[in-house]
Structure formats: C-alpha cells, structure tokens
From Swiss-Prot:
InterPro entries, alphabetized: Inosine/uridine_hydrolase_dom (IPR001910), IUNH (IPR023186), Nucleosid_hydro_RihC_nonspecif (IPR022976), Ribo_hydro-like (IPR036452)
Protein name: Non-specific ribonucleoside hydrolase RihC
Gene3D superfamilies given in the database record: Ribonucleoside hydrolase-like (3.90.245.10)
Active site per UniProt: 233
Gene Ontology cellular-component terms listed: cytosol
Pfam families: IU_nuc_hydro
Its job: Hydrolyzes both purine and pyrimidine ribonucleosides with a broad-substrate specificity.
Length: 304
C-alpha cells in the first residue's frame, strides 16, 4: 500500500529532484504540495512548483504558503539556485493556479478529510508547519509523522553552525521540534554525503525528459559541481520514506537556538544524552551512499 504524503517545499533545484521522487517512487502517494519562502520568494517557489507539476502532468493540488518567516526578515539562497530558483531550463507556459487558500489551511483540510493519518514532508523552512500547529493544534492527531530535511548535529551550511532551512526560520523550527510530533530529521550529517556522482549526471540527458530537465537545472546548481558530484539535500527526505534501510537513525533530544547572536538556527542535537531531556526526534546520522545513488537513479528512471 502506498504511503500518503504531503510535501512542503521551496523549489529550488534539488527540490525538483525530490518532487520527482515524491511523484514517481512507487511506495509514495503525493496528495498535496505546499510552497514556502526559502530558496527564493514564495511567489517564485510557487511558480516553480506549478511548472514542475505541469511538466509531469501531475494531478496534485498545490497551495501557496508563507511569504516570510514568523518573526525575521527573509534571507534566501538565490546564490545557490539562481535568481528564479530554478535556472537553466525553459518550461512551457501553462494555466495552472494554486488553491485559493493558504498552505496551512490546505494541509489542515487534507489531514482532516483523510481516511488515515498522513506523513508530512518538509524540505524547506518550517514556517507553514509551525503555522499549522499554531492555528490547528488538533491536527497533530492526523499526522503520522513529520520528515524534515533540515538541521545538523555538527557544522552548518548557512552559518558556521546552522543549516539553511532551520536558520531561515528558527522560531518556526523551535515550535515544530517541541510539538510532540514524531519527527525524522535528515540533516547535513547525511545530506552532505548524498551525492549524485559525475558519471551518473552525465547520463541524464539521454535517460528521459526528466533527465534532460534535471541535467539542465543541475548545471546551474551551486551545491557541488557536475564534475565532482552534486549534493541532493532534499532528496534525502524522500529517500528515507521510500528506503528507510539506507539510513542509520538515533533518537535524540533536539533544540533549536533562537536567541544566539552568532548561533541562531543551530540545532542542538544531544547525541550523548547530556542534557537529560527525552528524545523528540529520530536523527539520521549515517547513510548508505551507494544505496542512495542506486535508488535515486531507479526512481528518476521511472519518470517520463
């Protein structure tokens, strides 16, 4: 039986690969997509998400979400993904529009009308998820688990200690980690190792239309290089859902720093239990890199 999921995303070049996997992995049933400001503005992430859904002719509703973090100004990652968020490929024009409701409302409605609890997958800043929990706290009973691409038990990639998705909206992340939800955290400890290798990247243009599109986007992606391999951060969250055996998880207490002058957005991951707090997340600390690469190639080959 396919696992029903809702994907909250901020496309983003590596988001495109994650969305492909969410659509075409046979284990998953993507029921709703929502967008959030992160890699670029929410207007751009929404446009990019709609372009991808049209590219794949996917019958998945999409709702536009938060345009700003809860309390902070938005800082984006256009330097990594390009000004539009998905530079490098000319998508055809389309008439698709987002739902006439905000993301947190769309998620709430999907959860409350579902026949079974749904897994949320958040591969951008956690603003929409925090808004959902604030406005509709009763929804926690309809959420099977939350799988996050974000955080780090070690170094950051946006500041010395903070990973981008958490650093953009630390207050939202803090609320989410203290929500009582069952959380799986796929952070930089595994995503920095989740490379698509250069020899595989070179085969993409001859694979299928999805391969051609991803190759064009990847050529403009600044998280690695086409010659040394590209980090597929967001794809890890989908990989865990489809192939959890590829990851080594450890239950940990995770706190999010919101006050530090230099450390805001840091995920304090208490691997050794020194803080004496109960675990609130399953944290991915290791990944079978070759297994991940095989799975990624398999799922991209399933796309048109």
């Amino acid at each position: 039986m396919r696992l029903p999921i809702i994907l909250d995303t901020d496309p983003g070049i590596d988001d495109a690969a994650a969305i492909a996997a969410a659509l075409f992995a046979p284990e998953l049933d993507l029921q709703l997509m929502t967008t959030v400001a992160g890699n670029v503005s929410v207007e751009k992430t929404t446009r990019n998400a709609l372009q991808l859904l049209h590219f794949w002719n996917a019958d998945v509703p999409l709702a536009q979400g938060a345009s700003m973090p809860l309390v902070r100004p938005l800082r984006d990652a256009a330097s990594v993904h390009g000004e539009s968020g998905m530079e490098g490929y000319d998508f055809v024009e389309h008439q698709r529009q987002p739902l006439a409701k905000p993301a947190f409302q769309a998620i709430r409605d999907a959860l409350m009308h579902a026949a079974e609890p749904i897994t949320l997958v958040a591969i951008g800043p956690l603003t929409n998820i925090a808004l959902l929990l604030t406005q509709y706290p009763e929804c926690v009973f309809n959420i099977r688990r939350l799988v996050i691409m974000g955080g780090s038990a070690g170094r950051g990639n946006f500041t010395p200690n903070a990973e981008f998705n958490i650093a953009i909206d630390p207050e939202a992340a803090a609320k989410v980690f203290h929500s009582g939800l069952e959380i799986v955290m796929c952070g930089l400890d595994v995503t920095n190792r989740a490379l698509l290798a250069a020899d595989y990247l070179a085969t993409l243009p001859t694979l299928n239309q999805t391969g051609k599109m991803l190759h064009a986007l990847f050529s403009h992606y600044r998280s690695g290089s086409m010659s040394s391999g590209l980090r597929m951060h967001d794809l890890c969250a989908i990989a865990w859902l489809a192939r959890p055996e590829l990851f080594t998880l450890q239950p940990c207490f995770v706190a999010v720093e919101t006050q530090g002058t230099w450390t805001a957005g840091t995920t304090v991951v208490d691997i050794e239990g020194r803080l004496g707090q109960p675990a609130n997340a399953q944290v991915a600390l290791d990944i079978d890199v070759e297994g991940f690469q095989r799975w990624a190639a398999e799922v991209i080959a399933l796309a048109p």
